[in-house]
Swiss-Prot record:
Cofactor(s) for this UniProt protein: FMNH2
Binding site for FMN: 125-127, 246-247, 286, 301-305, 327
Swiss-Prot/TrEMBL keywords: Amino-acid biosynthesis, Aromatic amino acid biosynthesis, FAD, Flavoprotein, FMN, Lyase, NADP
Ranges for region Disordered: 36-60
One of the record's GO molecular function terms: chorismate synthase activity
GO biological process, one term: chorismate biosynthetic process
Annotated source species: Histophilus somni (strain 2336) (Haemophilus somnus)
Pathway in which the depicted protein is active: Metabolic intermediate biosynthesis; chorismate biosynthesis; chorismate from D-erythrose 4-phosphate and phosphoenolpyruvate: step 7/7
GO CC annotation terms, alphabetical: cytosol
Cytoplasm in keyword set: no
Name of this chain's protein: Chorismate synthase
CDD domains assigned: Chorismate_synthase (cd07304)
Length: 360
């Protein structure tokens, strides 16, 4: 199975399955000299880990990261950074009934057809459990971007189902209260929406159902010049990385699909000697960063792992009923915020190193 790596100069490779012994990653291309320990990585892992609130899966994993290589005397050496996180709360018996059945909406069918077999225990490699190592690698990238270039990569949840936050709360990204975002389990900047989210998730959990979500990732203080036209555009690589997150079905850069209804006089980001007058482009022009905040929005589908009976087929293509008995999130978008932050940080650091390699 290919496709386990991302990046050129800053390259991340992950391995492991949902119910395996452990998950791990190799980070290549990290410059030497960055002060780094597990304590720098753990906070982001704690934001993502399961079992931390009543709104997410009850599966409990400590998600304690262990650095195996690439760090000496508390600093990166420039060699490959190896990390692992052990699985401790697998309940593989929950998946015995779907061993020969395909869960609708999951990768069960496509994995079986492509490879001739699949790890049915929690989805194996296709499980969002794999993203824990992306967050670990992304935490390293975020630290380097912040300490060496002042770049901040942060995200927030903007919609669950039909409930949306007040757009005025995030109209000026420089004024977003990030402390407020991280103070509630929904990563939501709008206090008035939190209570509505709470009520919705409670209802869904009682019904055994799930719901989709939308979240936004913002990178501030990104310098002008990141991105390689024509096929290595920064926005193209960001879209590729964000679409690679489990359950993501759409990616928008800047105003995204809203540009369809805009006129040229409205959409163009006019300039004055003092700077840009707007940021409809989301901080990227011609595939190259413009120096404005980079803004990307992703939409995540409702998980198909629900306790409502659904129709499917088995390995013999016979009709069967399927119900998922494992422990799952009623809204995967909640825990996706640190994952999306990680993917944006990985792409930005990769492009930053490529920029430094060829430009003054």
């Amino acid at each position: 199975m290919a496709g386990n790596s991302i990046g050129q100069l800053f390259r991340v490779t992950t391995f492991g399955e949902s119910h395996g012994i452990a998950l791990g990653c190799i980070v290549d291309g990290m410059p030497p000299g960055l002060a780094l320990s597990e304590d720098d990585i753990q906070p982001d892992l704690d934001r993502r880990k399961p079992g931390t609130s009543k709104y997410t899966t009850p599966r409990r994993e400590e998600d304690k990261v262990q650095i195996l290589s690439g760090v000496f005397d508390g600093k990166t050496t420039g060699t490959s950074i190896g990390m692992i996180i052990k699985n401790t709360d697998q309940r593989s018996q929950d998946y015995g009934e779907i061993k020969d059945r395909f869960r609708p909406g999951h990768a069960d069918f496509t994995y079986q057809q492509k490879y001739g077999l699949r790890d049915y225990r929690g989805g194996g490699r296709s499980s969002a459990r794999e993203t824990v190592m992306r967050v670990a690698a992304g935490a390293i990238a975020k630290k380097y971007l912040r300490e060496y270039f002042g770049i901040e990569v942060r995200g927030y949840l903007s919609q669950i189902g039909e409930i949306k936050i007040d757009p005025q709360v995030v109209a000026d990204v420089s004024k977003i209260d990030w402390a407020k975002v991280n103070s509630n389990p929904f990563f939501c900047p709008d206090e008035s929406a939190v209570e509505k989210f709470d009520e919705l998730i409670r209802e869904l959990k009682k019904a055994g159902n799930s719901i989709g979500a939308k979240l936004t990732i913002v990178a501030e203080h990104v310098p002008v010049g990141l991105g390689e036209p024509v096929f290595d555009r920064l926005d193209a690589d960001l879209a590729h990385a964000l679409m690679g997150i489990n359950a993501v079905k759409a990616v928008e850069i800047g105003d995204g699909f809203a540009v369809v209804e805009q006129k040229g006089t409205e959409h163009r980001d006019e300039m004055t000697p003092e700077g840009f007058c707007s940021n409809h482009a989301g901080g990227i022009l011609g595939g190259i960063s413009s120096g404005q905040p980079i803004i990307a929005t992703i939409a995540l589908k409702p998980t198909s792992s629900i306790t409502v009976v659904g129709r499917s087929v088995n390995l013999n293509n016979e009709p069967v009923d399927v119900i998922t008995k494992g422990r799952h999130d009623p809204c995967v978008g909640i825990r996706a915020v640190p994952i999306a932050e990680a993917m944006m940080a990985i792409v930005l650091l990769d492009h930053l190193l490529r920029f430094k390699a060829q430009c003054k």
